[in-house]
UniProtKB/Swiss-Prot annotation:
The keyword Ribonucleoprotein does not apply. Its main location: membrane. The chain crosses the membrane at residues 19-39, 51-71, 83-103, 112-132, 143-163, 195-215, 227-247, 260-280, 292-311, 315-337. It comes from Arabidopsis thaliana. The keyword Transmembrane applies. The lineage of its organism: Eukaryota, Viridiplantae, Streptophyta, Embryophyta, Tracheophyta. This is WAT1-related protein At5g40230. It is a multi-pass membrane protein.
Length: 370
């Protein structure tokens, strides 16, 4: 009986520690790409990205308010004069800027490009961690060499995706086929300025996302309450976005949303991505760390391609395929370097985590199943 109970305990611990986080992160990637696709469809019908950003934070705040009151733990809310509140406000400012830049980038390009560029996140995070002395560089270490090489390869892949669009390799059957008079040479030598601008904006977004990860880690160390932190984050982002978006959007009538794809995109983004998606990301960051979360980024490319072709009639371009392959190679090189570094530290008996403290198996199971 004891043995059976022990086996059940181990199985339950594995389920809470590995299966639940994995399923949650896959679901978040699907929801995020779905939000990008829906937003792109809404912008094609005239939705202003300022309106989208403002209402996204408003909806997320309203959704999380009752949840923070119901599921909030006994820890008191941080005072406005404490470092916790200042860090949450700074987190909201960075998150607001990243969402504004990202929405504009998708307007210029596509959700598929956004998913491809998102693979820069680990490289950016590593670079920022080095700059802020949160990561140690030992040039003779294979782990450090892998992270440096992976960062360079990732940036190279992003440049390919941004600067080289190339011919179509996959398109919706309902789209008009390209003219046979357009030569491959014209595809190779042509530059789409909108595509390049969109790519640069999206690269800026994921640089800000990397900054957001580091700040979020600091907040969770000071105040480890996921739902409350995300609620305060969205509340501060709402207060920041209100004057900016109302000033930037000259047509106030655009803030009146009628039933349709525009209203659906706002409700979807605020009700799922900025609220529950942010809570799951924060929980996963606290439980597994930022490297684990970033492992799921390449999955978003496949999801974005499928959704873009099916719902937007987007085409898949050769440059995106080649660049995404290079990006993924660099991405997994950085991840291998990080995993190698962690294994060396484990063997050496050191317990050092640059972004978040590690958890024991029992603590992880408790965190994941709370």
């Amino acid at each position: 009986m004891t043995r059976g109970a022990g086996g059940e305990t181990v199985a339950w611990s594995y389920f809470c520690r590995d299966v639940v986080p994995f399923t949650a992160m896959v679901a978040v990637e699907c929801v995020t790409v779905g939000s990008n696709t829906l937003f792109k469809a809404a912008t094609l019908r005239g939705l202003s990205f300022y309106v989208f950003v403002f209402y996204t934070y408003v909806v997320a705040t309203l959704v999380l308010l009752p949840l923070s009151l119901i599921f909030g733990r006994s820890k008191r809310l941080p005072s406005a004069k404490t470092p916790v509140f200042f860090n949450i406000f700074l987190l909201a400012l960075v998150g607001f800027m990243s969402l504004i830049v990202g929405c504009k980038g998708i307007e210029y390009s596509s959700p598929t490009l956004a998913s491809a560029i998102s693979n820069l996140t680990p490289a950016f995070t590593f670079t920022l961690a080095v700059i802020f002395r949160m990561e140690q560089i030992v040039l003779r270490s294979s782990a450090t060499q892998a992270k440096i090489i992976g960062t360079i390869v990732s940036i190279s892949g992003a440049l390919v995706v941004i600067l080289y669009k190339g011919p179509k390799v996959l398109t919706d059957a309902s789209l008009t086929p390209p003219s046979p008079t357009i030569s491959l040479y014209q595809h190779l030598t042509s530059f789409d300025s909108s595509w390049i601008i969109g790519g640069l904006l999206l690269a800026t977004q994921y640089l800000l996302v990397s900054v957001w990860y580091i700040l979020q880690t600091r907040v969770m160390e000071l105040y480890p309450e996921e739902i409350t932190v995300v609620f305060l984050y969205n509340l501060c982002a709402t207060l920041i976005s209100a004057p900016v978006c109302l000033f930037a959007e000259k047509d106030l009538n655009s803030f009146i949303l009628k039933p349709g794809v525009s209203l659906a995109s706002v409700m979807y983004s605020g009700g799922l991505v900025s609220s529950f998606g942010s809570v799951i990301h924060t929980w996963g960051l606290h439980l597994k760390g930022p490297v684990y979360i970033s492992l799921f980024k390449p999955l978003s490319i496949v999801i974005a391609v499928a959704m873009g072709v099916m719902f937007l009639g987007d085409a898949l371009y050769l440059g995106s395929v080649i660049g995404s392959l290079i990006l993924s190679l660099g991405f997994y090189t950085v991840i291998w370097g990080k995993a190698r570094e962690d294994s060396i530290k484990t063997v050496a008996g050191t317990e050092q985590s640059p972004l978040l403290p590690s958890h024991t198996i029992e603590e992880e199971a408790s965190l994941s199943c709370d």
